């Protein structure tokens, strides 16, 4: 007895040579060479490079403004973490 496959796949013909092409909705063409694209810093960057004179070294997070401080962890949260989530509040 011969089995008959119940799924009928449609023919899908692929190109023999896959070419890089832009997305149809792209507003710009692809560059001729991809090796020159990532060769330097982004051209749209507006931030100046950090120099030792302008950068600030902080050794403790508490020296930073409050928005950079760690949020306090309650005892109930610690119990939940230590129990692997099996702790009910």
Swiss-Prot record:
UniProt GO BP: 2-oxoglutarate metabolic process; tricarboxylic acid cycle
**KW Mitochondrion (keyword) present:** yes
Entry keywords, A to Z: Mitochondrion, Transit peptide
State the superkingdom.
Answer: Eukaryota
Q: List the disulfide bonds.
A: none
Q: Does the keyword Mitochondrion apply?
A: yes
> Can you cite an annotated GO cellular component?
oxoglutarate dehydrogenase complex
**Cell location:** Mitochondrion
The membrane-spanning stretches of this chain are none
Please give the InterPro entries that the UniProt record associates with this protein.
Kgd4/YMR-31 (IPR020373)
The entry's family comment says:
Belongs to the alpha-ketoglutarate dehydrogenase component 4 family.
Q: How does it assemble?
A: Component of the 2-oxoglutarate dehydrogenase complex (OGDC), also called alpha-ketoglutarate dehydrogenase (KGDH) complex. The copmplex is composed of the catalytic subunits OGDH (2-oxoglutarate dehydrogenase kgd1; also called E1 subunit), DLST (dihydrolipoamide succinyltransferase kgd2; also called E2 subunit) and DLD (dihydrolipoamide dehydrogenase dld1; also called E3 subunit), and the assembly factor KGD4. Within OGDC, interacts (via N-terminus) with E3 subunit and (via C-terminus) with the complex core formed by E1 and E2 subunits.
Function in brief: Molecular adapter that is necessary to a form a stable 2-oxoglutarate dehydrogenase enzyme complex (OGDC). Required for incorporation of the E3 subunit (dld1) into the E1-E2 core (kgd1-kgd2) of mitochondrial OGDC, and acting as a stability factor for the fully assembled complex.
Indicate what this protein is called per its UniProt record.
Answer: Alpha-ketoglutarate dehydrogenase subunit 4, mitochondrial
